[in-house]
């Protein structure tokens, strides 16, 4: 029995030893595979970093290293294939190891006691064997790390200045993508190696060296900008390829022809990568980057083309100005007497041209501004590329639109015509030589008309008018004394009139201005504005004849154009010019296109649908006139109506001072000594009267001496009120002479509208009527006159006042009419109801 047990124990120990040996072999193979995996991507990454750094040196080096890249990529492919094979073998070993483990578990369950001792012994043996194997592994790992370090090239600190950013960016992108693929594998490998090396006595140093090597390789391939300090330190200690920061710092001095060479090299790299099987570098991002670069360059090229076209147009405009100035100088040689004036006018026109060109450019590039009518000239555009450019299309569209608008404005009917007539005796002919020169230059002017039409297109009409006014001002300042106009223009002389018409048709604006300058040099003009209107008239007439729709001999002008020219005209200085026997007279009729006065058309704002209450309605109770359908008027009417009813309503009290009784009512008097309810009623009525009359809410001079008379109708309503007070002085109204007026209505209107005055000499007066009011519906019934009669008899006890002793305070137009009618004269007395001593 013992022999059987010993045999079983030996068998089990042999089985365990074999399983341990196999497990150790699989672990060794896994570690070697992981190292192979690490070395493979490291070599590829370092070769890529090396190629990216060396590709920035020169073009020949790039071409030589293209082959190295392809060879290295092929070696990488082989390494990946071997790794795949190793993984397959590892899977087979792992399956066998799992089966053996299951068999070991079964044996352990069968004899647990024997297995415990064997396990203890096997663990010790395993530790001894593992120590020796780990030392061998660590030596192998160290050797591989040193080989990797030696394979790295030394850092090249000096690089050429013609490196470029585009190749750097593409290489960095590919490296980053590879690093992302490698990171997953490298992390697992690092964990395995660290777990194996930790237990060994020399493991810490090797671990640190291995980690630093991996970190250096990964950071060099990524070219990270976030940690420049770490990369510089590693450059000092270890030979690491140059980082992307150093490369970017040396990208400033880039040359244009080398860009094209680098592009070609990049395209070749893409082609080689696509041909290789299982290449890790994708070619799609490089193509997209190149497309983006090409699009950006095309945009820049279009912008540069626009700038060149604008610059060429400006230069061509300046050339035209110089040509036209030279043509003007040739004309000046024929007329030596006009050289000084011509030079000044040409210089000013050139300045205006520059200003107008600047305005045109501002209007083109800033559409928010109001566009002016400007004609575009296409100068020196010969190539098909320029003709098809956006800038020329914009100019052509604007030119066509402006021309269309001007044709429409010419076709439109003209509202008014101005006649320019020259008085026959006003102009005398003393210099026939100037007339011959004027007629002789006609043929020469015909030849120059085509050239001067360009100047018309550049300059606007407003600039032309301003130029003419400046020229006129200069000529009037330099005009000699005791001289007359050179030419005699008479409407009765038909041949000369025809010559003038022909000259208007053939000559351009500047030729006509030159002729008038030659006239104005020898003529004093008293009215500068008249001459300027003549020039502007002739100028705009010739401008109208440019278009086919206008008549050939039309010398009329719209009045609004002359008003525009007079507004834009500079204010001339006041020069004292001598009076001459003959002067220029221009008769201009009034403008036919005057703005008519805005008629106050009574618009019907409310629909008349046959309702009873429509339009203005007057209330029978309060007498207010309001619009029935207007809510605002209705609310105002309600307020006034309620106030009027409450104020006018008279209940009556016990002690009434009845002064007189009439069939339509009675008159009562209220004194300050009366009860409070009576005084309260008087105050309420006085407030209503003040609002109706528009009086100031001012206290009376002496409330204790006032007397109030009320006219109460039979229906117990207060329809009249009179407030009187004691005064000392009054002032006589000054009566004005009335014009001859036939009807009484006109007389009443005149009395109401005219202003009235009073004298400053005071006259004695006793009774002053502060307020007198009668309800509007009860007027023309002698209510006011009856109240004054009662006042005259009851104001002072035992005496009857005369009309000369009564004064009125600041009467309204109706009150003034009543006072004149009651007193029988317009020279009645007035006083200030606030202060009885002073006049109004």
From Swiss-Prot:
Reaction catalyzed: L-lysyl-[protein] + acetyl-CoA = N(6)-acetyl-L-lysyl-[protein] + CoA + H(+)
Protein EC: 2.3.1.-
UniProt effect for mutating residue 773 to G: Decreased thermal stability. Strongly decreased enzyme activity
Result, substituting residue 690 to N: Strongly decreased enzyme activity
Effect of residue 771 to A: Strongly decreased enzyme activity
Phenotypic consequence of residue 803 to A: Strongly reduced autoacetylation
Composition-biased stretches (Basic and acidic residues): 1-25, 131-140, 178-188, 319-338
Post-translational events: Phosphorylated during mitosis, when associated with chromosomes.
Tissue: Widely expressed. Expressed in heart, brain, liver, placenta, lung, kidney and pancreas. Highly expressed in muscle.
Result of changing residue 644 to A: Strongly decreased enzyme activity
Effect of mutating residue 725 to A: Strongly decreased enzyme activity
Zinc fingers typed CCHH-type, residue spans: 617-641
Main location: nucleus
Effect seen on changing residue 786 to C: Decreased thermal stability. Strongly decreased enzyme activity
Coiled-coil residue spans: none
Binding residues for acetyl-CoA: 772-774, 780-785, 812-814
Crosslink (Glycyl lysine isopeptide (Lys-Gly) (interchain with G-Cter in SUMO2)) position: 332
GO cellular component: chromatin; chromosome; nucleoplasm; nucleus
Keywords: Acyltransferase, Cell cycle, Chromosome, Isopeptide bond, Metal-binding, Nucleus, Phosphoprotein, Transferase, Ubl conjugation, Zinc, Zinc-finger
The keyword Metal-binding is assigned to this record: yes
Any one GO molecular function term: protein-lysine-acetyltransferase activity
Main function: Acetyltransferase required for the establishment of sister chromatid cohesion. Couples the processes of cohesion and DNA replication to ensure that only sister chromatids become paired together. In contrast to the structural cohesins, the deposition and establishment factors are required only during S phase. Acts by mediating the acetylation of cohesin component SMC3.
Quaternary structure annotation from Swiss-Prot or TrEMBL: The subunit structure is controversial. Monomer. Homodimer.
Protein family per UniProt: Belongs to the acetyltransferase family. ECO subfamily.
Domain notes: The N-terminal region seems to be responsible for association with chromosomes, thus excluding any involvement of the Zn finger in this process.
The name this protein goes by in its record: N-acetyltransferase ESCO1
């Amino acid at each position: 029995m013992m022999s059987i047990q010993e045999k079983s124990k030996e068998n089990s120990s042999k089985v365990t030893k074999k399983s341990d040996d196999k497990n150790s072999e699989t672990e060794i193979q896994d570690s070697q595979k992981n190292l192979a995996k690490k070395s493979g991507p490291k070599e590829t990454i370092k070769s890529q970093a090396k190629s990216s750094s060396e590709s920035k040196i020169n073009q020949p080096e790039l071409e030589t290293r293209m082959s190295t890249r392809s060879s290295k990529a092929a070696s990488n492919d082989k390494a990946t294939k071997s790794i795949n094979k190793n993984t397959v073998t590892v899977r087979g070993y792992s399956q066998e190891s799992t089966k053996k483990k299951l068999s070991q578990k079964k044996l352990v369950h069968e004899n647990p006691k024997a297995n415990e001792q064997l396990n203890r012994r096997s663990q010790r043996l395993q530790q001894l064997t593992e120590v020796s194997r780990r030392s061998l592994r660590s030596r192998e790992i160290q050797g591989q790390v040193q080989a990797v370090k030696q394979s790295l090239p030394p850092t090249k600190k000096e690089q050429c200045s013609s490196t470029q950013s585009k190749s750097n960016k593409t290489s960095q992108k590919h490296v980053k993508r590879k690093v992302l693929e490698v990171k997953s594998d490298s992390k697992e490998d690092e964990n395995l190696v660290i777990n194996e090396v930790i237990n060994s006595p020399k493991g810490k140093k090797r671990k640190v060296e291995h980690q630093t090597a991996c970190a250096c390789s990964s950071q060099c391939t990524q070219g990270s900008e976030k940690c420049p300090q770490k990369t510089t330190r590693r450059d000092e200690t270890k030979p690491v390829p140059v980082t992307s920061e150093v490369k970017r710092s040396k990208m400033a001095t880039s040359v244009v022809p080398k860009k094209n060479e680098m592009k070609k090299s990049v395209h070749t790299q893409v082609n080689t990568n696509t041909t290789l099987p299982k290449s890790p570098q994708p070619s799609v991002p490089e193509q997209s980057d190149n497309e983006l670069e090409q699009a950006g360059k095309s945009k820049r090229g279009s912008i540069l083309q626009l700038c060149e076209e604008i610059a060429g147009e400006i230069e061509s405009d300046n050339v035209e100005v110089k040509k036209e100035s030279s043509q003007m100088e040739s004309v000046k040689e024929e007329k030596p007497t006009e050289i000084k004036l011509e030079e000044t006018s040409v210089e000013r026109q050139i300045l205006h041209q520059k200003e107008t060109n600047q305005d045109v450019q501002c209007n083109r590039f800033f559409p928010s501004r109001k566009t002016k009518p400007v004609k575009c000239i296409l100068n020196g555009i010969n190539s098909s590329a320029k003709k098809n450019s956006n800038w020329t299309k914009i100019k052509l569209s604007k030119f066509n639109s402006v021309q269309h608008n001007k044709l429409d404005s010419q076709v439109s009917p003209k509202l008014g015509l101005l006649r320019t007539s020259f008085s026959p005796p006003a102009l005398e002919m003393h210099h026939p030589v100037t007339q011959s020169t004027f007629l002789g230059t006609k043929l020469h002017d015909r030849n120059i008309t085509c050239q001067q039409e360009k100047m018309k297109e550049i300059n606007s009409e407003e600039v032309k008018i301003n130029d003419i006014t400046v020229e006129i001002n200069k000529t009037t300042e330099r005009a000699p004394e005791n001289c007359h106009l050179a030419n005699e223009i008479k409407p009765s002389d038909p041949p000369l009139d025809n010559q003038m018409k022909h000259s208007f048709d053939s000559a351009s604006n500047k030729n006509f201005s030159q002729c008038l300058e030659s006239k104005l040099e020898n003529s004093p003009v008293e009215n500068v504005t008249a001459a300027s209107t003549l020039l502007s008239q002739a100028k705009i007439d010739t401008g109208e004849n440019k278009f086919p729709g206008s008549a050939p001999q039309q010398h009329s002008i719209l009045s609004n154009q002359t008003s525009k020219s007079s507004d834009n005209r500079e204010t001339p200085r006041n020069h004292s010019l001598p009076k001459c026997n003959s002067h220029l007279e221009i008769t201009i009729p009034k403008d036919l296109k005057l703005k008519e006065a805005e008629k106050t058309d009574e618009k019907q704002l409310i629909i008349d649908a046959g309702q009873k209450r429509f339009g203005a309605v007057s209330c029978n109770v309060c007498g207010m006139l309001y619009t029935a359908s207007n809510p605002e008027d209705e609310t105002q009417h309600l307020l006034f109506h309620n106030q009027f009813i409450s104020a006018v309503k008279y209940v009556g009290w016990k002690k009434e001072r009845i002064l007189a009784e009439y069939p339509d009512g009675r008159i009562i008097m209220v004194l300050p000594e009366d009860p409070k309810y009576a005084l309260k009623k008087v105050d309420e009525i006085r407030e209503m009267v003040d609002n109706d009359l528009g009086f100031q809410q001012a206290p009376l001079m002496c409330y204790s001496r006032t007397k109030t008379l009320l006219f109460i109708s039979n229906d117990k309503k207060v329809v009249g009120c009179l407030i009187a007070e004691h005064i000392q002085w009054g002032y006589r109204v000054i009566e004005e002479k009335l014009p001859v007026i036939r009807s009484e209505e006109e007389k009443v209107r005149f009395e109401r509208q005219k202003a009235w005055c009073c004298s400053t000499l005071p006259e004695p007066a006793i009774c002053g009527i502060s307020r007198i009011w009668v309800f509007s519906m009860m007027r023309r019934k002698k209510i006011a006159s009856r109240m004054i009669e009662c006042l005259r008899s009851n104001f002072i006890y035992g005496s009857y006042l005369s009309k000369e002793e009564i004064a009125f305070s600041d009467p309204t137009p109706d009150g003034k009419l009543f006072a004149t009618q009651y007193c029988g004269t317009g020279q009645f007395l007035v006083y200030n109801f606030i202060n009885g001593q002073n006049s109004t």
